Regions:
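N-terminal signal peptide c-region/cleavage motif recognized by signal peptidases
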Residues: 19-21
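Ligand-binding cleft/hinge of the Venus flytrap
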Residues: 67-75, 154-177, 207-211
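Short helices/loops that flank or line small-molecule/ion binding pockets
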Residues: 80-81, 85-98, 111-113, 139-142, ...
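Flexible hinge/capping segments at coil-to-helix
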Residues: 129-146
Length: 277
């Protein structure tokens, strides 16, 4: 190889190295303590877990818990509002420190770590009164059109259930994905879909808010799952610190009180072995 070609080759390699993506694996707890704040990715369209009040303030069950946990760590909270579909990618990229209200799934556990659970979740089906749907039975949903939030556990659950229907020679449920729960409910009210599948506790809030709409809860679908906060896998110290703060809030009764306030009931939550196999 002559000198000119060598120079061109070396320069090309140098430019290639500069343009390669850089993956940062720093422990987020160090930055949280240094900056005096924890950056939280949140989609505040999921009442009663997280939503905005009439003044635009982010409120709900998880924001109250996050504020208390952050105070226990001696830091403030900075929210970064984004669509739910962008939250886990932001967490993995390291542009945020944590996110609340994630269904705990084996697939997500491969990509992120979980703080100990803050709640439990069971999905349900909601429809308009007077429609042909009477129950949440999968066979009854076969062939119907259902709205779900994109990239959520309910969407993944329904995709898995569609495989079951197909294996039995039955029609799949046609799934239409939306960014927010409000969009799924609007699609239902406008009769663009036959039903909506999402967390049961969210539907109680939705029915209360939309008293003018003839919404009816058809029943539960799928099993119970824990809900937890997510943290980047490169930050085990932050995960441990947040878990420690939640354990304090469980021990002094604060977590149970917040569950009663926002859900109207309490649930017993595991602290170990809570990721489904």
């Amino acid at each position: 190889m002559n000198l000119k070609l060598k120079t061109i080759f070396s320069f090309s390699v140098f430019i290639t190295i500069l343009t390669l993506p850089v993956y940062v694996n720093a422990e987020a707890l160090d930055d949280v303590k240094k900056n005096g704040k924890i950056i939280v990715a949140i989609d505040p369209t999921f009442a009663p877990f997280e939503y905005t009040d009439s003044t635009g303030k982010i409120v709900g069950y998880d924001p109250e818990l996050i504020e208390l946990a952050a105070a226990g760590m001696g830091v403030k909270v900075e929210y970064r509002v984004m669509a739910f579909s962008g939250i886990i990618p932001a967490l993995i990229a390291g542009s945020v420190d944590m996110t609340p209200t994630l269904n705990v799934t084996p697939e997500r556990a491969l990509r992120i770590d979980y703080v100990i659970p803050t709640a439990s979740s069971v999905n349900a089906v909601i429809a308009l009164k007077g429609t042909s749907l009477k129950t949440a039975a999968l066979d009854e949903l076969s062939g119907k059109t259902c709205a779900v939030k994109q990239t959520t556990q309910p969407e993944q659950m329904m995709k898995a259930m569609n495989e079951k229907l197909k294996s039995e020679g039955k029609k799949a449920v046609q799934l239409l994905g939306f960014e927010t729960i409000e969009q799924t409910l609007s699609a239902l009210v406008d009769k663009r879909v036959d039903c909506v599948v999402d967390d049961k506790s969210v539907f109680y809030e939705a029915i209360a808010k939309r008293k003018d709409a003839p919404l009816v809860l058809l029943g539960e679908i799928g099993g119970v799952q824990p809900i937890a906060w997510g943290v980047n896998k490169s930050s085990p110290k932050l995960t441990a610190a947040l878990s420690a703060e939640l354990k304090k809030l469980k021990a002094n009764g604060t977590l149970s009180n917040l569950q009663r306030k926002h859900f109207g009931f309490t649930s017993t939550l595991p602290e170990t072995d809570f990721v489904p196999k």
